[in-house]
Amino acid sequence: MFSPQSRLRHAVADTFAMVVYCSVVNMLIEIFLSGMTFEQSLSSRLVAIPVNILIAWPYGMYRDAIMRVARKASPASWVKNLADVLAYVTFQSPVYVAILLTVGADWHQITAAVSSNIVISMLMGAVYGYFLDYCRRLFKVSSYHQAKA
């Protein structure tokens, strides 16, 4: 069930990475940049956990596909970082739009929020990629080790 080749192991590693990373980073952003109280941010993060659980593994597979293309283009580390940013922004932005539509935001609010989120995502996408790689090593995901070799 949790063999190194297990899809479940891969899904658990990706889910762990997304829930932990998004909870910590977004809480810091909400409190220190957005001016939310600790309680407001905690509520926001608790609501976000189910969404993160649902999108973590699909995002991991999407990122892996983009990384394969990037690796074929160039082995340079800047290409990997650019691919991480591209994967993060192109996957997370539509998810964010859907969340904002669900909570009743208008198009003006959505445009402002998503634009800001894209800028932050451009800074955080590569960092999340490194954290995801670390979690996959921590969980001993074998396909990850084979892809890196």
UniProtKB/Swiss-Prot annotation:
Q: Name one GO molecular function term.
A: L-amino acid efflux transmembrane transporter activity
The entry's localization annotation reads: Cell inner membrane
Give the transmembrane region(s). 16-36, 46-66, 85-105, 112-132
For the keyword Cytoplasm, the answer is no
Instruction: Tell me which InterPro entries the record gives.
Output: Ala_export_AlaE
Per UniProt, the keywords (alphabetical) are: Amino-acid transport, Cell inner membrane, Cell membrane, Membrane, Transmembrane, Transmembrane helix, Transport
Cellular component (GO) terms are: plasma membrane
Entry keyword Zinc: no
Q: What does this protein do?
A: Exports L-alanine.
Hey, which family's this protein in?
Belongs to the AlaE exporter family.
> What is this protein identified as?
L-alanine exporter AlaE
The primary gene name is alaE
